[in-house]
Amino acid sequence: MSVGTPLGDGEEVSFSRDYFVEMDVRSEEAYELASEWFDEVVFTKKLVLDGPPDWGELKDELRFLRERYEKVALLLVTNRPGLIKEVKKRNLRALLYVQGGDMRVNRLAIENGVDALISPWLGRKDPGFDHTLAGMAARRGVAIGFSLAPLLSAGPYERVQILRFMTKTWQLVDKYGVPRFITSSAETRWEVRGPGDLMSLGRNIGMDAPRARASLNFYPRRLLKKV
């Protein structure tokens, strides 16, 4: 079953209840396994930056990855918020994700209109996401990535804290209509999870079944229209 969901300006994305997208896997082995469970998979190149990269080399690598995987994202991991704008203004022909955690990075990622901010609560003692950022993310079309990976490596107490922060973030995302997706962010095949497990994560942080499904279908597919 599929229906057309209006996006504004007459644009529609077909919503199929049985079509699922994994937006963030970070190795070939993870990609291969995820491709068995999902209809579309985005391969993510993780880029840790303390300063500007070799732009030519980065473009060449992304070109190779597009040829191999077709749908590619660049995950920027940095403590220097100014680098977000530098990367954003380059024509890299890939989705741009920013790893959340540092509050300055969270804010600058949203202000600069990146495609997605992944786990803004990572390593924090609070969600790293508030009403101001939620409103800005909604206006600028910045998706929030709800990643399973940190939960897999966390101890019991930390896992409870992460789930609490994810729940608070989800409440703001839902209230302000922020784009979102649920992802494994798998770096190995052992971290890959299927659509059912990811929807269960959504339910655990307060999503109802339709919203959890839309976080693996409608919102990811809308984001993929950018590439």
Model-derived segments and their meaning:
Residues K71-I84, D102:
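A glycine-rich, hydrophobic loop/mini-helix early in the fold
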Residues Q99:
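N-terminal glycine-rich "phosphate-gripper" loop used for MgATP/nucleotide binding
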Residues M1-F43, L49-E67, G82-K85, N91-L95, ...:
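Charged catalytic cores and adjacent phosphate/nucleic-acid-binding surfaces used
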